[in-house]
């Protein structure tokens, strides 16, 4: 869902090119499409996106400027694949870009407040709540990308 939001919102910013890829840290769903409820919710919100699941690999550090994770398990798994400090510096919780949460240190005891809950097989309302979290964070992330580009 985050990839759908980021790719669509990023495409609306003139002069900004954001290429989005989405992957998990396990191989459970490699090659599968998005969960039907997730896709339904993002399409109802006006986002278009085609998703095929893939697994995060250490090589992804070489082709991405930012690595955004949804939860602490993914945060730890992605950091474990980092080969250097420059790789680790690319890793962020997506919600750390939410203006209401940007003050939270991901290495503090409050890290859990930065997690995006997985609504898998829950109600459509749960997916909509997650979409709202993602939208707020993506807006903040796009602002950060623009700041970094203009620095």
Question: Which residues are covered by each model-predicted region?
Answer:
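Phosphate-binding/catalytic loops
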Residues: 72, 77-151
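Conserved active-site segments centered on acidic
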Residues: 1-64, 143-150
């Amino acid at each position: 869902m985050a990839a759908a939001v980021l790719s669509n919102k990023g495409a609306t910013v003139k002069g900004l090119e954001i290429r989005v890829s989405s992957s998990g840290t396990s191989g459970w769903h490699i090659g599968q499409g998005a969960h039907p409820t997730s896709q339904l919710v993002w399409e109802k919100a006006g986002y278009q996106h085609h998703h095929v699941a893939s697994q995060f690999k250490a090589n992804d550090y070489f082709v991405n400027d930012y690595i955004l994770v949804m939860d602490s398990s993914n945060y730890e798994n992605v950091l474990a694949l980092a080969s250097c400090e420059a790789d680790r510096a690319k890793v962020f919780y997506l919600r750390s870009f939410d203006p209401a949460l940007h003050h939270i240190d991901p290495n503090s005891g409050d890290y859990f407040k930065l997690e995006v809950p997985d609504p898998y097989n829950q109600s459509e309302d749960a997916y909509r709540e997650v979409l709202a979290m993602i939208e707020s964070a993506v807006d903040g992330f796009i602002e950060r990308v623009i700041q970094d580009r203009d620095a």
